[in-house]
């Protein structure tokens, strides 16, 4: 069980990364605080809605969990109870942010220059990373209380994982055809589920969770480069 001082240090570390990233966005893009505050609120509400959805799934699955074995229980908890509601809510709320608060910059794609288009996408990418960092910061608090084992390592890797998955929320928010949403969403769901599973099992399996984080970093960078060039 973590002490109050340890929890406070954990939260400081988590939100420090978010604050540093916000400072980078402001300096690099000369952006006002307004979109960052909106992102903070959208991410905070994503946390609350995710918790609500996960609670509903948990109560609806009580009978199933009583009869299932350890392996199926881990899979259900990591992929259905935890990852699926969370990734659905995060992708949906970020899409709402883009549609409601950024559509005026993106709707007239034929009237803006390629340089302006790249600048808009770059800013949205930076904001999507900030979105993931804020979500991870709040989530780390919940995990610190419920699952204190390996929480320090999980805090660092979780922040990076959520930040990199932000690139996929950006892609989901900007595709025009519904079928093109499926692939990036399945990726975020599957990767997040695997990450949760390895950290839930613990021991040496945590190494596989760290490998997943490095894979997501590489994949997110290449994904952004392809997305930006389209």
Question: How does the language model describe each region?
Answer:
Residues 1-230:
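Hydrophobic alpha-helical segments at protein termini of multi-pass membrane proteins
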């Amino acid at each position: 069980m973590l002490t109050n001082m340890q929890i406070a240090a954990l939260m400081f570390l988590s939100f420090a990364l978010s604050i540093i990233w916000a400072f980078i966005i402001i300096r690099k893009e000369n952006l006002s605080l307004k979109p960052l505050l909106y992102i903070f609120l959208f991410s905070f509400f994503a946390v609350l809605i995710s918790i609500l959805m996960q609670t509903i799934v948990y109560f609806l699955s009580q009978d199933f969990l009583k009869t299932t074995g350890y392996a199926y229980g881990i899979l259900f908890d990591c992929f259905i109870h935890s990852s699926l509601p969370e990734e659905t809510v995060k992708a949906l709320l970020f899409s709402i942010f883009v549609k409601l608060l950024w559509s005026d910059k993106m709707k007239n794609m034929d009237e803006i220059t390629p340089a302006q288009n790249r600048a808009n996408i770059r800013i949205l990418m930076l904001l999507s990373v900030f979105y993931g960092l804020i979500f991870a910061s709040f989530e780390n608090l919940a995990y610190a209380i419920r699952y204190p084992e390996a929480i320090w390592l999980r805090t660092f890797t979780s922040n990076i994982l959520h930040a990199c998955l932000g690139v996929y929320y950006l892609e989901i928010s900007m595709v025009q055809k519904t079928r093109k949403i499926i692939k990036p969403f399945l990726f975020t769901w599957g990767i997040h589920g695997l990450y949760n599973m390895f950290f839930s099992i613990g021991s040496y399996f945590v190494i596989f969770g760290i490998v997943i984080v490095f894979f997501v970093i590489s994949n997110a960078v290449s994904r952004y480069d392809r997305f930006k060039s389209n």
